[in-house]
Swiss-Prot record:
E.C. number(s) listed in UniProt: 2.5.1.7
Pfam families named in the record: EPSP_synthase
Catalytic machinery residues: C115
NCBIfam families: murA (TIGR01072), PRK09369.1 (NF006873)
Binding residue positions for phosphoenolpyruvate: K22, N23
GO process terms (BP): cell division; cell wall organization; peptidoglycan biosynthetic process; regulation of cell shape; UDP-N-acetylgalactosamine biosynthetic process
Compartments (UniProt record): Cytoplasm
Entry GO MF terms: UDP-N-acetylglucosamine 1-carboxyvinyltransferase activity
Keywords linked to the UniProt accession: Cell cycle, Cell division, Cell shape, Cell wall biogenesis/degradation, Cytoplasm, Peptidoglycan synthesis, Pyruvate, Transferase
Catalysis: reaction(s): phosphoenolpyruvate + UDP-N-acetyl-alpha-D-glucosamine = UDP-N-acetyl-3-O-(1-carboxyvinyl)-alpha-D-glucosamine + phosphate
Gene Ontology CC: one annotated term: cytoplasm
Family: Belongs to the EPSP synthase family. MurA subfamily.
Record's protein name: UDP-N-acetylglucosamine 1-carboxyvinyltransferase
Length: 419
């Protein structure tokens, strides 16, 4: 397994170009199964989960190519089963189910894998498809969906806010007969992006970005060209990297309006921030950040995917900050690793109390999930001495060339190839 070797401390400064958002690219790639004509998807990040998805779409019979953009022609799809060998590494595979049953009347997906963060069941996806008229069976580790004729529009009230299930219901409803209303829908920018992509192919979706999405079913979707929005979590991660090192950064190809909660907290921490249409700059003027209190919440609240990075910020800040995680259980796995580097923190159920220290020390640490592992790499950049981050395949699932981008900001980081 590959590792990162990071030598610190360094002050990170310079420019970084933000990649397309994985969490928008994945649902968009799966939603392309609904289209009868070729689509071109631009600004797709080069990541393991994206490669797996392209492989999966190919196995279903789609023609998939990558040359700059990703090109998908789902016209020839003639296989309706997403097999275990591809699904096991990636939870997002469940997103194949809605489009398959909506367009072809049948679909089956092996129960998914992915990051080990708490309970993330697929039951909300299943109940949503059932309300649209699909018959669902769970057999031999597969979720099997079928419908005679077309799915039927329905008024669906989500039990709890779920990005994944909102995508499933919204994509399936585009080809359903009649109108579907999703109440208590997720409002994330990646949902908006997926809806905008579907509309570009001829879908009729309104209300994306609010908690009430209305989808008027259409007979078919055609082709089109679409550009994936910038990755707000990657943007936030690099902004934190500069903030904790007293540095200065310019993020290009960013989308500031997707990061309001994060930018507000960085300003509270003492960062000088400016934004333009597609850029964000942050300058700490060499200062140490001030501790901030953070409570994660569904969008437009503070994103859970930025929690680990802000935990680290608090652990090296002036003062004491409290982090409350309301979205996922089991999401403080980075803290014991940071304590090995000299951090001071106590965890009480879903709350972490972080006491800032002036300096962390390099240590051997282990990545446990995608965002936690990013915080360990950033910790290595500012710690005294050498940090080895093990199991970095987690990082490769969500960050495109993170070591190259950090090196360009002055970090001393190398990938060490594993056996």
């Amino acid at each position: 397994m590959d590792k990162f070797r990071v030598q610190g401390p360094t002050r990170l400064q310079g420019e970084v170009t933000i990649s397309g958002a994985k969490n928008a690219a994945l649902p968009i790639l799966f939603s392309a199964l609904l289209a009868e004509e070729p689509v071109e998807i631009q600004n797709v990040p080069k990541l393991k989960d994206i490669d797996t998805t392209m492989k999966l779409l190919s196995q279903l019979g789609a023609k998939v190519e990558r040359n700059g953009s990703v090109w998908i022609d789902a016209g020839p799809v003639d296989v309706f089963c997403a097999p275990y060998d591809l699904v096991k590494t990636m939870r997002a595979s469940i997103w194949a189910l809605g489009p398959l049953v909506a367009r072809f009347g049948q679909g089956q997906v092996s129960l998914p894998g992915g990051c080990a963060i708490g309970a993330r069941p697929v039951d909300l996806h299943i109940s949503g498809l059932e309300q649209l008229g699909a018959e669902i069976k769970l057999e031999e580790g597969y979720v099997k969906a079928s419908v005679n004729g077309r799915l039927k529009g329905a008024h669906i009230v989500m039990d709890k806010v779920s990005v994944g299930a909102t995508v499933t219901i919204m994509s399936a409803a585009t080809l359903a007969e009649g109108t579907t209303i999703i109440e208590n829908a997720a409002r994330e920018p990646e949902i908006v992006d997926t809806a905008n992509f579907l509309n570009a192919l001829g879908a009729k979706i309104k209300g994306q970005g609010t908690d009430r999405i209305t989808i008027e079913g259409v007979q078919r979707l055609g082709g089109g060209v679409y550009r994936v929005l910038p990755d707000r979590i990657e943007t936030g991660t690099f902004l934190v990297a500069a903030a904790i090192s007293g540095g200065k950064i310019l993020c290009r190809n960013a989308q500031p309006d997707t990061l309001d909660a994060v930018l507000a907290k960085l300003r509270d921490a003492g960062a000088d921030i400016e934004t333009g249409e597609d850029w964000i700059s942050l300058d700490m003027h060499g200062n140490r950040p001030k501790a901030v209190n953070v409570r994660t919440a569904p969008h437009p609240g503070f994103p859970t995917d930025m929690q680990a990075q802000f935990t680290l910020l608090n652990l090296v800040a002036e003062g004491t900050g409290v982090i409350t995680e309301t979205i996922f259980e089991n999401r403080f796995m980075h803290i014991p690793e940071l304590i090995r580097m000299g951090a001071h923190a106590e965890i009480e159920s879903n709350t972490a109390i972080c006491h800032g220290v002036k300096q962390l020390s390099g240590a051997q640490v282990m990545a446990t999930d995608l965002r936690a592992s990013a915080s360990l790499v950033l910790a290595g950049c500012i710690a005294e001495g050498t940090t080895i981050v093990d199991r970095i395949y987690h990082i490769d699932r969500g960050y495109e060339r993170i070591e190259d981008k950090l090196q360009a900001l002055g970090a001393n980081i190398q990938r060490v190839k594993g056996e």
